[in-house]
Regions:
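Catalytic phosphate/metal-binding cores of nucleic-acid and nucleotide-processing enzymes, i.e., regions
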Residues: 1-138
Length: 138
């Protein structure tokens, strides 16, 4: 396994462990061909992507995450970016603003979605609330 692949696998593993506090069934998703559905499975109606790279390609990764959400047939998505030398709880956690109710779906294409960044600790709690609200909706 290459060094960069090993870093990515370790970041996914650490992300899953952190998410299992609320979602015990969270797990790394096995690769699934050309219709990638994200790196994380086991969170209801949600696709998760994890990145651990030296070069940050935020716009590209956000678009990948939205595509994976669509491929997975999910309602929500998130992107976790490992921050070197920080505890997993302080890694960057990104979600599209519309999923948080912060903007209307005024844009015609998901590519126009704006994103909100928070630390992973807050992001995990926010995601829990967003999913709970989804299940409580009539």
């Amino acid at each position: 396994m290459s060094k960069s692949k090993a870093k990515g696998t370790a970041a996914e593993r650490d992300t899953v462990r952190y998410l299992q506090f609320y979602w015990p069934l969270a797990e790394r998703r096995a690769l699934s061909g050309n219709k990638d559905r994200g790196d994380i499975a086991g969170i209801p109606r949600t696709a998760g992507e994890v990145k651990a790279a030296v070069k940050i390609e935020l716009a590209k990764w956000q678009q990948e995450t939205l595509t994976e959400m669509q491929n997975a047939g999910a309602d929500h998505c998130f992107l976790v970016i490992k921050v070197p030398y920080k505890n997993v709880s302080k890694w960057d956690f990104w979600m599209p603003a519309y999923q948080l109710g912060l903007e209307d779906l005024r844009f015609k294409d998901l590519k126009e979605a704006r994103w909100v960044r928070m630390d992973f600790e807050l992001g995990r709690d926010v995601l829990k609330g967003v999913i709970a609200a989804l299940w409580a909706a009539p």
